[in-house]
């Protein structure tokens, strides 16, 4: 099972790469990516852009928190797994499901910060194969190229406050409609901002 959580605001290259990756997986008789989304109890889509506009806020990372990833990435994946029969069967036996996390060898600090939560997790055994193999970002890029795949590009919302200046400039020139939507989110939140980190 390969899961990807769609926040409803991914950058265009991410959506394109899903199609490319699915074709690559099909050619190798591997399962395609299962895309999950944040929904309410009635099945209505809850995307992060609409949430920011309705609440007159920016993504939580602008305020020093990372709740957007928890709510729109981790939450939908956990909800899917909670209802996925193979996972339920493993848990019914009192065992844990293996979950593979794609942190590269340069991100060991992130893995280390998650360790106490990973050890306490009753449902999942987290594995970090890229770290175990010693693959840094350059190694990962090389392996992606060796597999005949294009580079996927950075996965983030098109209005993520963590974007670098060159990423914003690229979006402004390549996707002016998304750039204007990102500006609209900021302008919508501006009257309510008192402090931003």
Residue map of PLM features:
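Nucleotide-activated chemistry modules centered on ATP-dependent adenylation/adenylyltransferase
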Residues: 1-197
């Amino acid at each position: 099972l390969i899961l990807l959580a769609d926040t409803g605001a991914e950058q265009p290259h991410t959506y394109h790469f899903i199609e490319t990756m699915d074709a690559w997986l099909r050619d190798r008789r591997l399962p395609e990516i299962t895309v999950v989304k944040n929904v309410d109890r009635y099945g209505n889509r809850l995307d992060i852009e609409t949430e920011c506009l309705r609440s007159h806020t920016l993504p939580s990372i602008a305020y020093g928190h990372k709740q957007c990833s928890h709510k729109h990435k981790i939450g939908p994946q956990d909800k899917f797994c909670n209802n996925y029969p193979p996972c339920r069967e493993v848990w019914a036996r009192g065992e844990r499901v293996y979950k593979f996390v794609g942190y590269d060898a340069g991100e060991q600090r992130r893995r280390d910060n998650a360790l106490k939560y990973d050890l306490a997790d009753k449902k999942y055994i987290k594995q970090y194969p890229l770290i175990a193999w010693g693959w840094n970002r350059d190694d990962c890029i090389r392996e992606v190229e060796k597999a005949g795949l294009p580079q996927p590009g950075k996965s983030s919302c098109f209005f993520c406050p963590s974007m670098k200046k060159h990423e914003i400039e690229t979006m402004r020139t390549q996707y002016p409609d998304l750039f204007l939507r990102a500006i609209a989110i900021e302008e919508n939140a501006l009257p309510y901002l008192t402090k931003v980190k």
